[in-house]
């Protein structure tokens, strides 16, 4: 870009803004003499995961032991990096009590490695010792505190309520269970493969960590900035170009990032000031970035790291299948947000940027090799290679690409910094996965999932729409304030069973709860991504949240469409059906988006807006040719009326 505006946030301001709205970034800025210890442990942790990823060097290692190294080391780093309160971020050094907690947390988890044969053998016959239970208790408490520091309070509240339910929920009407004492619940949560060391932490230790490190490597090679430049070069000259570029950039960033708030701050620190300068309202600028960044969590191939866990939860599909299935819904979402920015720009007469302020597309195309790491991963996944192997090749491709430009060439210090940053980025995800395991464990041990499913089915009766509506509300409430991986784990274990019990295909049910858990980040009143964007835009947070909700309305409609018609998820459908469904869905989304933005081809007359909304809903109505046909005719009618009125006004203006 030829110009950097004075309102664009510096790196320090970005970090402060991110820490304000995202607990994951609120770590100590100056650990003092402990800095080298933190670096050594973090670098070692990343090297451990790279070593484990190579089948030739990794060798056999029981997954509980790998998970213990993964989680134990992460907990130690969290206590060394994250202060008790945010006010401790700027204090120099690490307090003695956090050092103590770091060693205690590491020791309690490493205890599993030392006593592995006992825990998996004789202890299950003769019973666990008092020491075993004490260590497990310490480990659980310290895990919860570490998660509070690195992730936030919402997931801790849910996990704590789960533990209390496991202990005291025996007499709750309808939701009662057989009951557990502290010893029984603790050993199940800490020493089995169904809770803390269950699927989420196993996936985190094998796949997620490597893909997060891949994202760090892309940042080091300048791919993130290339995404921004490519988006502005391709869309910046059109009507409302700055907002369209923000949407496109966030879609590209979302392919490799795992946090809507982090994406909002990283991209928004540049795009939001640009949108304001182009005369977009501050609330809209914040909303556009927040809705696009939130959409990044549903963008393949990473999908906020939830895709890996979904592939394990959904028995009928592989990870590469999940990636392919997620493409059409994600494109529909971003197309809808893109159209929303267009309608807003047309309504307020906001034009594109002059050519002098845009990067040269010729120059950008000469740097197309920067996309090689991403293309490498996607290609290998499509060809059927494992995610681990694909991630390794992607990391190698990123390292190779870094040498193409002098300012991105990675020396020893750059490599060490990348290894450390890989661990830092992974810490909140690891803590969230482990704590989500507590929630899953309680659901499994008490049968709570079946009870919730039964309750939702009773409320809905035989009405699928009502069941989806109640499930949507549950997912949004459960997803508020949770990171993407934990968000999906919680909603999948507590909400998806109801849809599956009703007969909804397993893939569609899991995508449904995943989508609604994600859009919680832009659903008032707890819309963290919108709040982060409003902080950059200096806008009213609630107005930004409401506007983001309007822009991202597709995210609230698409899940209903693919439950009623799984062809949108490429399930049991021929190519003709899929193409027709996508076309009608796009037209429907355009109509709904125009209604939300209060502008279509021209300003609405009082009757046109509700009719256009009706046409949009009819166009996305599932598997009914007559209703969809009627919606198309109504859409064409409104578009024709508006076009003729606009043409008449334009002619009169030209004559004058």
Where are these regions (language model features)?
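Conserved, well-structured core domains of diverse proteins
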Residues: 1-126, 133-137, 646
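Long, contiguous bundles of hydrophobic transmembrane helices that form the permeation core
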Residues: 2-36, 324-425, 528-617, 646-656
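Transmembrane alpha-helix interface/packing and boundary motifs in multi-pass membrane proteins
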Residues: 148, 215-219, 250-259, 291-297, ...
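Hydrophobic transmembrane alpha-helices that form the pore/transport pathway of multi-pass ion
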Residues: 228-296, 302, 306, 484-516, ...
């Amino acid at each position: 870009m030829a110009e950097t505006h004075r309102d664009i946030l510096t790196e320090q301001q970005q970090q402060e803004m991110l820490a304000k709205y995202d607990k994951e970034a609120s770590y100590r800025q100056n650990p003092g003499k402990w800095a080298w210890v933190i670096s050594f442990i973090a670098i070692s942790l990343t090297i451990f995961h790279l070593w484990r990823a190579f089948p030739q060097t990794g060798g056999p290692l029981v997954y509980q032991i790998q998970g213990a190294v993964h989680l134990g080391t992460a907990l130690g780093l969290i206590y060394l990096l994250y202060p008790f309160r945010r006010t401790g971020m700027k204090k120099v050094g690490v307090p003695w009590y956090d050092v103590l907690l770091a060693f205690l947390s590491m020791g309690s988890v490493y205890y599993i490695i030392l006593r592995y044969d006992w825990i998996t053998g004789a202890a299950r016959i003769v019973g666990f010792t008092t020491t075993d239970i004490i260590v497990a208790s310490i480990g659980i408490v310290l895990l919860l505190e570490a998660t509070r520091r690195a992730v936030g309070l919402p997931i801790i509240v849910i996990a704590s309520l789960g533990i209390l339910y496991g202990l005291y929920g025996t007499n709750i009407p309808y939701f009662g269970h057989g009951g557990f004492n502290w010893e029984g619940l603790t050993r199940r949560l800490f020493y089995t493969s169904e809770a803390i060391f269950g699927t989420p932490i196993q996936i985190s230790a094998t796949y997620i960590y490597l893909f997060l490190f891949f994202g760090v490597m892309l940042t080091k090679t300048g791919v993130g900035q290339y995404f921004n430049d490519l988006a502005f070069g391709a869309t910046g000259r059109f009507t409302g170009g700055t907002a369209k570029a923000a949407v496109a950039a966030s879609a590209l960033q979302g392919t490799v990032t795992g946090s809507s708030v982090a994406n909002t701050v990283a991209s928004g620190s540049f795009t939001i000031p640009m949108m304001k300068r182009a005369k977009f309202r501050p609330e809209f600028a914040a909303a556009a970035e927040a809705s696009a960044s939130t959409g990044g969590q549903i963008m393949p191939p990473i999908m906020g790291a939830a895709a890996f866990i979904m592939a394990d939860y959904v028995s009928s599909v592989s990870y590469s299948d999940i990636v392919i299935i997620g493409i059409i819904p994600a494109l529909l979402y971003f197309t809808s947000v893109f159209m929303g920015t267009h309608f807003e720009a047309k309504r307020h007469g906001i034009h594109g940027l002059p050519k002098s302020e845009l990067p040269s597309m010729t120059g950008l195309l000469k740097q197309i090799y920067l996309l090689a790491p991403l293309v490498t991963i996607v290609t290998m996944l499509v060809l059927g290679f494992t995610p681990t192997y694909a991630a390794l090749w992607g990391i190698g491709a990123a390292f190779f690409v870094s040498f193409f430009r002098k300012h991105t060439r990675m020396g020893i210090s750059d490599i060490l910094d990348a290894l450390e940053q890989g661990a830092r980025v992974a810490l909140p995800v690891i803590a969230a996965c482990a704590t989500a395991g507590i929630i899953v464990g309680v659901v499994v041990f008490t049968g709570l999932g079946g009870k919730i499913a039964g309750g939702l089915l009773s409320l809905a009766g035989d009405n699928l729409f009502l069941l989806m509506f109640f499930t949507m509300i549950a997912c949004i409430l459960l997803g508020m304030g949770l990171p993407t991986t934990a968000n999906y784990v919680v909603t999948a274990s507590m909400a998806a069973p109801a849809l599956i019990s009703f007969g909804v295909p397993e893939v569609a049910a899991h995508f449904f709860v995943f989508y609604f858990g994600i859009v919680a980040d832009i659903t008032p009143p707890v819309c963290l991504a919108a709040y982060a964007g409003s902080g950059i835009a200096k806008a009213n947070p609630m107005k930004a949240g409401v506007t983001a909700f309007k822009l991202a309305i597709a995210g609230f409609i698409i899940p209903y469409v693919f439950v009623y018609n799984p062809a949108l998820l490429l399930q049991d459908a021929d190519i003709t059906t899929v193409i027709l469904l996508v076309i009608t869905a796009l037209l429907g989304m355009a109509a709904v988006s125009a209604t939300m933005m209060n502008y279509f081809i021209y300003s609405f007359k009082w009757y046109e807006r509700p009719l256009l909304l009706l046409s949009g809903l009819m166009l996305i109505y599932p598997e009914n040719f007559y209703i969809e046909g009627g919606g198309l005719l109504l859409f064409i009618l409104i578009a024709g009326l508006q076009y003729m009125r606009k043409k008449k006004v334009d002619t009169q203006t030209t004559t004058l």
